[in-house]
């Protein structure tokens, strides 16, 4: 009878061993799954931190959307704006604060680097014909006038800060024709000497009478 009991106990132990191993294997598999899922989550978090694609950032970035720029559209808009500005202005520029000795020849040579010139006029004094230190230049193309204004305004030339402005559409420089340098012509004396002396005596007598009325005695 003793032998039978020992056999049965050994059988029970043999049969119980696989039941104990199964939960251990299941636990190990669960641990592996959790570790792999946690590692995947950590990798995703790292990627989000590097690329800046976290969920909180996505929610905040919804208010700040970046628009794609179309270079062709921008170029067309710029061209249309430039055309409008060119239509509003003429090809004439006003230049002031010119230094001494900077006349028509110097102006035409200096501003010819921006484009072809139609006309160059310098304002002059009516009597002396000296420069009044400002003038007008008319370009063939309006674009050249705009470039000349942008590059030469507030430009230091021979100790003078130039002031350059593009005149509006319809402006002309006809005004400066009356400031042309005039040639002084000496006129000869046509009156006789006796008549000139008589006129001088008459004026002198009138002056003495005026002085006498004011109480001043004058003899000549």
Swiss-Prot record:
SUPFAM superfamilies: RNA-binding domain, RBD (SSF54928). Signal peptide: none annotated. The keyword Signal does not apply. InterPro entries: Nop15_RRM, Nucleotide-bd_a/b_plait_sf, RBD_domain_sf, RRM_dom. Residues 1-82 are annotated as: Disordered. One of its GO terms (molecular function) is rRNA binding. Residues 9-30 have a biased composition (Basic and acidic residues). Residues 39-60 have a biased composition (Acidic residues). It is found in: Cytoplasm; Nucleus, Nucleolus. This is Ribosome biogenesis protein 15. It comes from Saccharomyces cerevisiae (strain ATCC 204508 / S288c) (Baker's yeast). The lineage of its organism: Eukaryota, Fungi, Dikarya, Ascomycota, Saccharomycotina.
């Amino acid at each position: 009878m003793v032998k039978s009991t020992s056999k049965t106990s050994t059988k029970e132990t043999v049969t119980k061993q696989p039941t104990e191993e199964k939960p251990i294997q299941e636990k190990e598999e669960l641990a592996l799954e959790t570790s792999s899922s946690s590692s995947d989550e950590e990798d995703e978090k790292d990627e989000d931190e590097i690329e800046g694609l976290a969920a909180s950032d996505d929610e905040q970035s919804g208010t700040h959307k970046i628009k794609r720029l179309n270079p062709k559209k921008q170029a067309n808009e710029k061209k249309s704006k430039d055309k409008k500005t060119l239509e509003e202005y003429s090809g004439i520029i006003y230049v002031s604060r010119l230094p001494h000795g900077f006349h028509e020849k110097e102006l035409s040579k200096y501003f010819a680097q921006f484009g072809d010139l139609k006309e160059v006029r310098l304002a002059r004094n009516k009597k002396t014909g000296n420069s009044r230190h400002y003038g007008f230049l008319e370009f063939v193309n309006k674009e050249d006038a705009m470039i000349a204004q942008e590059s030469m305004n507030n430009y230091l030339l021979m100790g003078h800060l130039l002031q350059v402005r593009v005149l509006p559409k319809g402006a002309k420089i006809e005004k400066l024709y009356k400031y042309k340098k005039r040639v002084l012509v000496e006129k000869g004396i046509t009156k006789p000497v006796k008549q000139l002396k008589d006129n001088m005596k008459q004026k002198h007598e009138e002056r003495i009478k005026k002085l006498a009325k004011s109480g001043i005695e004058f003899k000549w």
